Amino acid sequence: MEPVVGLQSSCAVSSFPTIEIWQDVLAQAMTGELIAAMNYTSLSEICDDPEEVADALEHAGIERGHAARFAAEGRRIGVAVQNNVEGKHWKKLREAFLRCIAARDFIGCLIVQEIMLESFAVASYARVGRVGPGTQGRTFAAIAAEEEEHIDHAMEILRAERARDVQGFDEKMYRLHLEVMTTLAEMLTKECRTGHCEVCHGTCVKPALFDISLSAAELRGASLQQYLKTLDMLGLPGEVTLQWVTQLPV
């Protein structure tokens, strides 16, 4: 489920072998999926409706399945795909979600997971799917499509919530935007500012993404476009949400 690279370390130009680049791309994706599985499991614990509990647990299982598929792609190329849900950026994202859990804020949880994290996952996975060789590309593309279904699943609930209280919903959306989207944007900034991400197995892979026809800027741009599209589907004014995005780290 989540953005493919959050790769912060020394940004000196690297000479990564292609397999090592894919190892790190898969590691970020696998970690994001495990975070999503943890989030859905936590969400199930605050749901009162048995159907909502079952739905959240089903989503958790799907995300764990995605993580397993990314690990399998690593084995296909002869590498062990590491993950680290305690990695700097992923830990911050998890903590933001857990604050919504502590407040029993079901809508806040949906906003963080389904709107913010899934938007980055859909867009970044789709981009990786276009350039990934063989089964890697097909796996990323397939999981991107599955993640998009998660967004669609949440839209009806969130639209109804916004219709009940537009101002309250939009204020919550903006508060979570500053908290969560700032971290997501930091993962794909041009310059590395906060040290190693604690997921990549070596130095920062971002400069090496060009070797597999990707770039952090491309992934960031696509992810933010998907996010804006999702906010538009919720009914938030485009002129407002565009200002939100321009405030994010670059």
Segments predicted by a language model, with ranges:
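Non-heme di-metal
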Residues: 1-250
